[in-house]
Amino acid sequence: MSIFHLKPLRQQTDEQLMTRAASGSDTAFEELYRRYARRLKGFFFMQLGGDEELAADSTHDVFLRAYESRSRYQEGRNVSTWLFTIAYNLCRNQYRSNAYEAQLLASLDAEPMTEQPMEVQLDAAALDQALEQVLSELPATLRHIFSLHYQEELTIPQVAEIVGIPEGTVKSRLHKTMNIIRKKLKQYEK
């Protein structure tokens, strides 16, 4: 029996908990759920159009899949990256099944962009709302990468592993996303 099994669950690393969960410990898996459920739900909420119910269902799906495949967990693998990879794949499946991107692009083409004068100044809440709107208009691939890196605070290598693309591509897509955001929010400059 290794020493980390003697520590209280809250003091164990994610990897230690996942190793215990892979060996059959439901309490260790419950602790991982406690640590990640809120972040994953927030990720789904942003990615799936702000649908609270769909975000909650998708979060449960992530943990169900993780629980079902816990015995195949590769010891030493970053648990956060593993869970967000599952979440990312669920989002991709959701987009495919709903043809979400096609609808989004069609609606963007149909709605003319209205520009407000430069003197319009927004308070922090309004700027946050404007940013959320810009993010919702981004193609899913850019939105996923932005969300994983800036909102979920994952590193570039972690994002690259989750999305399955090279780190350089992640960096260039983040740069492209930031340029789009700056351009669309330029009207809100003082």
Task: Show which residues each predicted segment covers.
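Short helix-capping/turn signature of helix-turn-helix
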Residues: 35-38, 47-48, 147-154
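Arg/Lys-rich amphipathic alpha helix in sigma70-family domain 2
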Residues: 68-75, 85-105, 176
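Structural recognition of an alpha-helix C-terminal capping motif at a helix-to-coil junction
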Residues: 57-64, 77-89
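Short, charged helix-capping/linker segments at alpha-helix termini
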Residues: 3-6, 22-31, 42-61, 167, ...
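Internal acidic/polar
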Residues: 11, 93, 101-128
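Residues within the DNA-recognition helix of helix-turn-helix
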Residues: 36, 173-176, 180
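Helix-turn-helix DNA-binding module
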Residues: 133-136, 140-144, 148-169
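C-terminal edge and immediately downstream basic/flexible tail or linker adjoining helix-turn-helix-like DNA-binding
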Residues: 1-9, 20, 50, 103, ...
